[in-house]
Amino acid sequence: MTNEDHKYINLLLEKNLIKSSCLEVGSAEDWCSLVPKFNNQGIKTIGSDLSKGKYVDHIIDFESDIKDIIPILQDETPFQTILCLNVLEHTFNPIQILDNLIQLLDSGGKLILIAPAAWPLHGYPIDCWRLMPDFYTKYAELRNLTIDKNLFRYLGFGPVDSYKKPHSSGFPLPLRKGLYFYYSKLIHKIFNTNGRNHLFSNHIAIGLVMTKN
């Protein structure tokens, strides 16, 4: 969880979009799990992961068949809120995971996602995907879900729609701050080269809220 991730989650809390009962997918790392925070705020929350952890109530592989998942969670479902934060990039079949999570949501429930669109590789244990805005838009269309456009954001930059161009979803430009940025820019100008970090940021995550219709 980055600072921008936390800001996004706090925004959703302010808007009262995170409600009981809630499931956090990927809660094994106790330093970044939201289970204690939500429970302390009166939002009944349980955690799940592939391995044991302080805030893991159920060990579940969400890439498995939904028939194997439902019996594990039968006493808790359906959920009003499911959070899947910084998980999808570490899976082989993110669509299978999303399909399973949607089936665990109540009608009108919220699926909250955060995943990188541009980010250095970081295996945990594997790193497979960088999901673009069009992926979420198409998925929501095919599964009859509604994306809140005001909350469909490049975290730390702004709404995804504000960066769209004809025939392109668009990426935020790098934040132009810090001595290193200007030093690097000068060096690239002297040697007539193009620095990748001057074309677009190499740390971009997308946050969004999908509602089950």
Annotated model-derived regions:
Residues M1-L17:
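Class I SAM-dependent methyltransferase Rossmann-like catalytic core
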Residues F92-D106, K110-N213:
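S-adenosyl-L-methionine-dependent methyltransferase catalytic module, highlighting the catalytic core
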